[in-house]
Curated annotation (Swiss-Prot):
One of its GO terms (molecular function) is pectinesterase inhibitor activity. Pfam families: PMEI. It comes from the Eukaryota. Keywords: Apoplast, Disulfide bond, Glycoprotein, Secreted, Signal. It comes from Arabidopsis thaliana. Expressed in outer cell layer of roots, particularly in the root-hair zone. Expressed in roots and siliques. This is Pectinesterase inhibitor 4. Disulfide bonds join C42-C51, C109-C158. One of its GO terms (biological process) is regulation of root development.
Amino acid sequence: MLRFVVLSLTLMVFINSSNFPKTAATPPGTYQNHTTYVKTACNSTTYPTMCYNCLSSYSSTIKSDPIKLCTTSLNLNVKSAKNATLVVSNLLQKAKAAKSHEVSILKDCVDEMKDTIDELKQAVAEMKYVRGGGKTTEEHLKNVKTWVSSALTDEGTCTDGFEEGRVNVETKKKVKKAISELSKTTSNTLALLTHYLSY
């Protein structure tokens, strides 16, 4: 079920991308209030309140720069992925200690989450080359979006085993909550990249 939600989130981001202005072309002086800029940017995401709550405290750093906006979102996304991975890893350790049949399912999920972290880090690294426009910049931006899309897919894959296998209800609840929150964050990051960076 969560995998369907993740795929739906990805589709929504790209379908709705044509409905929002490409802010990269907007002169920096257009937004005098940096907090307002962040709020406006977050309104282009699927979960605007979550987006604003995450990014508003960084508005003085982001200012009115779409690249700083997306880079900040990506860095926070990496942090969220690490936190979600920690939740699943702790459950895995408990399952191992109890010699539970859930071990293999949780291990697969942790592996997917590690891939998610790596992909988001790759996106952060690639963002360093997204500046100035032109064909090369466009290619780097495409790579960033690909890494983030892959991360979103892996987050959904993480929970596949919980749908197919026998898992403790409480364990499933904790994992789904952690991954669901992460998927929303990643969806927002992808939306910001899609709506606010275009060359």
